[in-house]
Amino acid sequence: MAIEQQHIITDKTLIRAAKAVSVIFTPFSIPFVAFLILFVFSYLRIMPLQYKLIVLGVVYCFTILMPTLTIFLFRKINGFGPGDLAERKRRYVPFILTITSYIFCLLMMHRLNIPWYMTGIIFAALIMMIICVIVNLKWKLSEHMAGAGAIIGGLVAFSALFGYNPVGWLCIFILIAGVLGTARIILQHHTLGEVMGGFAVGLICSLLVLHPFCKLVFRLFNIFLSVSYTHLT
């Protein structure tokens, strides 16, 4: 068993760098970073500062602070270390705690009448986590890479919505995604398949929820179902 737990890569500096990358680009930070980018680099920067601070405060509390605190308490109560949650069977409770926080975040944003293209970021992340929980029954997807895929999908979706060229940002975040995926493999937290699978889940969820074309297709499909139901009755 001791041989199986050893790192294949023995370079301690490389392992420390991989750990630092994993901590910096934690999945918890993805929604907050997405909102921050929107408020700084898109036309949403013209919104009142007070409004932006309220939205960022809500997102921070429910997507970073609450999940981090509840998972920390869960670890302390059960005597788990940070690495113990890498085991597939121990990931369900952290997932459920995070999903609960995101649901409360959506409810709060709904009460504040925040536009759909903002709440859609949280909704896409929520769907992504639910899929990860289901897949986790048999396989361990990388949540870090799911978050990276969601960011890239969100960039494509918002570029279509707001009409800007996303190539520069896409190059940056694709590079970050590659570094992050490599770090997860170096730390032996995931295989290449789990890294690629997580990225695909995040990318698809983000595009389906946020991209205007997908929303148009869903709307047309709903109209088709309504018309078909009317004719049948």
What are these regions (language model features)?
Residues 230-233:
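Conserved small/polar residues in nucleotide/adenosyl-binding loops
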Residues 48-64, 88-89:
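Loop-to-helix transition at the N-terminal end of transmembrane alpha-helices
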Residues 1-17:
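Short, Lys/Arg-rich, polar N-terminal cytosolic tail immediately upstream
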Residues 97-106, 147-152:
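Core segments of transmembrane alpha-helices
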Residues 81-97:
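Juxtamembrane helix-capping/reentrant segments at transmembrane boundaries
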Residues 42-50, 80-83, 111, 215-225:
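Membrane-interface helix termini and inter-helical loops of multi-pass transporters
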Residues 21-41:
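The first (N-terminal) embedded transmembrane alpha-helix
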Residues 115-225:
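Membrane-embedded catalytic cores of phosphoryl/pyrophosphoryl-handling enzymes
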